[in-house]
């Protein structure tokens, strides 16, 4: 519970009407003020008069940490050697904003490498440096002092009084009263898995990678545990081609240290990757799993969940995902997928495939949760961006705590403990001592928010007839309804909660807990380990039986019938109309969408019913509808990340609803619709004005707009003026050059700018401009220039060969110059690409340029 700060009540004489500081404060040369610990304190921030404090109070439960953020503002002149001390019978760790000279020194990538560097664009106020002495505060600047209080499990409840003393060299000291109230209960352990990804080889090089001292690794794990985490990602695991496995780095080294640090909880699952029992084949898979589970039971370890392909695209990575996870289907090991966008959430939530879906922040929705419950799947959340939003701790606290609680998630993870600018800890040069960022401290606050609300819900469950149970239930329901739909990376001070409301919620929860009486961990409320259901009751039965099953009286049968039709794929085409009719049934809707998607173009009779769902209030349902429409109008030809769609005879049917999806407020849905529309060709021309408008929007939408215009090619001719304006004259964005090339002769207005770029640039940029010129004006000289560049001494060979591949048969006149290169060692690194080009020429193919979605 954050401190309540009492303002100084003394009457202050102000020198003049415009000055806010008293003569005494000016004489001292500084003031000490409070800043909410959910908000970043920038070096140049100047506090208001009402922020100056004389007393700091903080309230926390036993075995809880709580932070206080103070600021010291230099007024008049600068300050030197500012010393902070705390007198308290409770432990208080003092941090200050990272020293500017140290921050500047750590900005040298050449010296400290990608994992040790602190990039210059990351603000200093993010990094907390352990220590009680600040060297210098320039006149008009401030420094933040971050005090982290810890009440041990055996702390005496009640008031603990102390002092905070701030004293710059040669200046009078400022002494603040410190009052810490310890609540008479200890919070329960969280029942959700709170973790972050950490790999030894992603830490600063001076720590030693996988050879770092055990003391260092133990300190890292202890830091995670002290910040509220109870789970971890273990990598690498080992090799299971013999039992017991050899070189099992995680079992032999990492896990014992994590146990020693108190990071892992036997009841909370952890993740494993990089050599798992499922890597073997056939019967050996079961033998390896049996050995592994016996070993983890013997050692009292938690459940290990297999970490599947990371952030897979859908549908492009479908084959990769199924190859990776299918060997574990039907085994006792659960599997996990990190889903970076809503398309993947829809695409990989199918029977028996994945048990734990860890979904990127903001993509968890009520319909996702409802479908996961029907399937027996678990939903967790993760983020790699939330701490960077304004660099305030507030989004971190919200994401870890209230977001996890609102959606009743099984886990909450962040990338990463330390990885480039995705870090939650940092290290001083040559030091092995981790130090936190403010977001890490905020994350711990969020985990504690979750623990308070979890404990209160347990009180109601234990005492349903208590006089306060109805009031508590109503309050919790109201709070949850208020928070549903808030995007974690978009939360700000005041939306959906003001900073003060976080502590008001916690205070109210604690007050209610006091009325019930604190209860210990509720053993019957720990989450059960469940696998995603197979829902196979109709598997293999005739299509007509499955169609009849769609009308069964029980939900399980209707769902099983739809999933059986999904497994039939195109052979289930006779069921298209029947599947369309059940899309109105929320319990069967998602299996029916999957079945229609697998049927493909022959599901066209269901388009009117599918089209209704692009207006659904939940983006999970909307993305499913858009992807099904895509398979009907422009089915995927190859399940790879570069796999293309090809328009079907039914393409025109899906354009209108996909344009609705293109306007979807959920940006990944808009992006997905754009990628489909671009494949449809002329019928999708009505999307061009929207795509043109998107060029003026932020990155995600401008990328979608460029994608449509590129893939529609000549059908997007109306976009040429806007593309030239978007390219800002010099066409430095290669994506714009490619869009103009795809449009072709209708982009003649771009010739002067492209000519200038081809003359002023070298390498890939020059090749793109020359390629575009040839596409637009079809002059042999442009093609020859491309070939001459390839033969030149400084050629970007891969780029030029890729451009020749895109031209295919249009470049047949240079085949005689290209073919001898296959015999040249100087071109051995592009022989495969040259063969591909010649193959296109022989087949009469002109692949063209496609947008990299």
Label each PLM-derived region with a short phrase.
Residues 351, 355-421:
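Catalytic-core region of carbohydrate-active enzymes that cleave or remodel glycosidic bonds
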Residues 174-275, 302-305:
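An acidic-aromatic substrate-binding cleft motif
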Residues 73-82, 134-190:
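Extended acidic/polar, glycine-enriched regions
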Residues 529-538, 556-571, 589-602, 612, ...:
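Structural detector for internal amphipathic alpha-helices that build alpha-solenoid repeat scaffolds
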Residues 277, 289-318, 326-343, 421-536:
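Catalytic domains of carbohydrate-active enzymes that cleave complex glycans
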Residues 20-52, 76-147:
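Surface-exposed binding patches on compact interaction domains or structured appendages
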Residues 53-76:
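Contiguous beta-strand segments within globular domains
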Residues 537-549, 570-583, 602-614, 635-661, ...:
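Amphipathic alpha-helical scaffolding segments comprising HEAT/armadillo-like alpha-solenoid repeats
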């Amino acid at each position: 519970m954050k401190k309540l700060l009492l303002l100084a009540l003394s009457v202050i004489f102000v020198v003049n009407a415009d000055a806010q500081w008293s003569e005494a404060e000016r004489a001292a040369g500084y003031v000490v003020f409070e800043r909410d610990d959910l908000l970043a304190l920038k070096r140049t921030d100047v506090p208001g008069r009402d922020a100056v404090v004389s007393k700091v109070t903080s309230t926390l439960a036993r075995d809880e940490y709580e932070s206080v953020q103070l600021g010291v503002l230099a007024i008049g002149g600068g300050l030197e050697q500012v010393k902070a001390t705390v007198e308290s019978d409770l432990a208080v760790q003092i941090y200050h904003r990272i020293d500017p000279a140290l921050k500047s020194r750590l900005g040298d990538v050449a010296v400290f490498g990608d994992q040790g560097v602190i990039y210059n664009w990351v603000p200093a106020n993010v990094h907390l440096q352990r220590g009680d002495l600040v060297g210098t505060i320039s006149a008009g600047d401030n420094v933040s002092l971050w005090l982290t209080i810890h009440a041990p499990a055996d702390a005496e409840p009640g008031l603990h009084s102390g002092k905070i003393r701030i004293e710059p060299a040669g200046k009078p000291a400022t002494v603040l009263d410190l009052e810490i109230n310890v609540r008479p209960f200890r919070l329960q352990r969280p029942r959700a898995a709170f973790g972050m990804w950490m790999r030894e080889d992603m830490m600063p090089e001076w720590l030693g990678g996988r050879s770092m001292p055990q003391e260092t690794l133990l300190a890292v794990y202890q830091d995670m545990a002290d910040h509220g985490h109870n789970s971890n990602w273990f990598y690498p695991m080992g090799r299971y081609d013999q039992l017991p496995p050899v070189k099992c780095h995680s079992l032999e080294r990492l896990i014992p240290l994590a146990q020693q640090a108190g990071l892992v909880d036997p009841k909370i699952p952890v993740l494993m990757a990089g050599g798992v029992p499922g890597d073997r084949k056939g019967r050996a898979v079961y033998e390896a799993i049996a050995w592994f589970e016996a070993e983890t039971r013997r050692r009292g370890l938690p459940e290990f969940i297999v970490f599947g392909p990371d952030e897979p695209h859908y549908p492009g990575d479908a084959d990769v995902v199924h190859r990776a996870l299918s060997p574990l289907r039907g085994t006792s090991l659960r599997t996990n997928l990190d889903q970076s966008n809503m398309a993947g959430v829809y695409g990989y939530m199918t029977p028996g495939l994945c048990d734990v879906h860890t979904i990127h922040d903001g993509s968890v929705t009520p319909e996702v949760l409802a479908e996961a419950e029907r399937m027996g799947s678990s939903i967790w959340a993760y983020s790699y961006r939330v701490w960077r939003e304004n660099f305030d701790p507030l989004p971190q606290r919200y994401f870890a705590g209230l977001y996890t609680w609102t959606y009743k998630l099984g886990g909450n993870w962040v990338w990463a403990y330390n990885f480039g600018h995705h870090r939650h800890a940092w290290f001083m040069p040559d030091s092995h001592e981790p130090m936190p960022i403010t977001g890490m401290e905020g994350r711990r606050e969020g985990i504690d928010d979750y623990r308070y609300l979890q404990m209160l819900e347990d009180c109601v469950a234990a005492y349903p007839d208590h006089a306060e149970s109805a009031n508590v239930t109503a309050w919790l329901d109201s709070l949850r309804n208020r928070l549903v739909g808030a995007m974690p990376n978009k939360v700000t001070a005041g939306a959906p909660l003001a900073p003060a409301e976080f502590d008001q919620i916690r205070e109210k929860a604690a007050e209610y807990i006091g009325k019930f009486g604190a209860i210990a961990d509720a053993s019957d409320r720990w989450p059960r380990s469940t696998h995603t259901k197979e829902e196979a009751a109709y598997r293999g039965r005739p299509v007509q039986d499955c169609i009849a099953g769609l009308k069964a009286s029980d939900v399980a049968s209707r769902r099983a019938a739809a999933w059986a039709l999904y497994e039939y794929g195109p052979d289930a085409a006779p069921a298209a109309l029947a599947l369309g009719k059940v899309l109105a049934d929320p319990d069967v809707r998602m299996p029916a969408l999957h079945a229609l998607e697998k049927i493909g173009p022959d599901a066209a009779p269901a388009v009117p019913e599918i089209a209704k769902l692009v207006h659904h209030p939940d983006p999970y349902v909307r993305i499913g509808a858009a992807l099904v429409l895509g398979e009907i109008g422009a089915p995927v030809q190859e399940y790879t990340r570069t796999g293309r769609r090809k328009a079907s005879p039914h393409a025109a049917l899906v354009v209108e609803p996909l344009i609705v999806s293109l306007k979807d407020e959920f940006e990944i849905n808009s992006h997905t619709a754009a990628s489909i529309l671009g494949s449809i060709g002329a019928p999708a021309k009505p999307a061009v004005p929207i795509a043109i408008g998107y060029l003026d929007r932020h990155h995600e939408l401008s990328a979608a707009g460029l994608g449509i215009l590129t893939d529609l090619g000549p059908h997007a001719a109306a976009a040429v003026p806007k593309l030239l304006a978007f390219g800002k004259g010099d066409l430095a964005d290669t994506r714009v050059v490619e869009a103009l090339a795809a449009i072709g002769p209708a982009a003649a207005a771009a010739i002067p700018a492209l000519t200038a770029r081809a003359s002023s640039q070298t390498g890939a940029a020059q090749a793109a401009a020359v390629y575009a010129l040839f596409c637009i004006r079809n002059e042999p000289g442009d093609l020859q220039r491309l070939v001459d560049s390839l033969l030149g001494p400084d050629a970007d060979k891969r780029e030029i060969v890729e451009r020749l591949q895109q031209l295919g048969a249009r470049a047949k006149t240079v085949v005689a110059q290209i073919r001898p290169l296959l015999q040249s060692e100087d071109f051995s690194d592009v022989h495969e690409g040259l063969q591909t080009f010649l193959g296109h020429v022989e087949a009469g193919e002109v692949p063209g340029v496609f947008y990299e979605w």
